């Protein structure tokens, strides 16, 4: 596609911005702190969820954060349109600090666990996308990798959906939120990734064993572990 690949040995966090500054015709999109991200979800995702749940009602929304734009923008819209009635929660993987931040009423940021098999979600800070709306978040749930990997296989078996671990985490979180809100609760979440990008890991027996996750998958679903 005509792209130039730049390999850097130093910390990667600021490399794209620094590289763009050296070029006359480059734009650094600043994914995590470009608040057009959050705004897009206020204008599109939030209204779409609200419209699709108009007949059934909506009690809760929950998802994990990477940039924070999806959670923040959708939460902002749903809180405004419902008069604050829709509960909005954050789902957090191991290794992220946001669960403790919410649970301690914004007093501490401490990592829960050492890391996760999920990719692109979880944070070590408040992004510019999330910061304006963090006080609208009503609660948070820590979702362990064992539950996420089991949901990957369950959705493939029961629904024919080939989802990634981040989507699986969101589904686990939505189910737990619904249980906590009570019988008949309507909860929305985001299915944000497919398994194709991760299939050489998620469906590899060796990889699952290396992460101590094989036992988390029900034995009748092991038939989907098709790679050595």
Enumerate the language-model features and the residues they cover.
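Short active-site-adjacent structural elements
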Residues: 149-151, 170-180, 196-200
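Nucleotide donor/acceptor-binding cores
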Residues: 184-186
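Short, well-ordered alpha-helices that flank and scaffold nucleotide-derived cofactor binding pockets
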Residues: 51, 76, 80, 175-179
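Active-site/ligand-binding loops adjacent to catalytic centers
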Residues: 10-21, 25, 78-165, 180, ...
């Amino acid at each position: 596609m005509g792209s130039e690949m730049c390999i850097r040995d130093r910390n990667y966090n600021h490399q794209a911005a620094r590289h763009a500054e050296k070029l006359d015709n480059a734009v650094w999109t600043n994914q995590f702190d470009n608040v057009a991200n959050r705004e897009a979800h206020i204008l599109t995702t939030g209204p779409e969820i609200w419209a699709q749940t108009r007949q059934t009602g909506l009690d809760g929304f929950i998802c994990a954060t990477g940039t924070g734009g999806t959670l923040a923008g959708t939460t902002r819209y749903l809180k405004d349109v419902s008069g604050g009635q829709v509960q909005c929660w954050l789902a957090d993987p191991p290794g992220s600090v946001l669960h403790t931040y919410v649970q301690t009423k914004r007093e501490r940021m401490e990592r829960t666990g050492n890391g996760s098999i999920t990719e692109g979600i979880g944070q070590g800070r408040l992004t510019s996308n999330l910061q304006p709306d963090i006080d609208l978040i009503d609660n948070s749930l820590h979702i362990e990798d064992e539950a996420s990997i089991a949901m990957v296989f369950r959705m493939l078996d029961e629904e024919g959906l080939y989802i990634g671990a981040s989507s699986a985490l969101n589904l686990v979180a939505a189910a737990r939120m619904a249980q906590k809100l009570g019988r008949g609760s309507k909860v929305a979440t985001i299915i944000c990734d497919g398994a194709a990008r991760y299939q050489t890991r998620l469906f590899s027996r060796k990889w699952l064993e290396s992460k101590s996750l094989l036992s988390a998958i029900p034995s009748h679903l092991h038939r989907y572990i098709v790679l050595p």
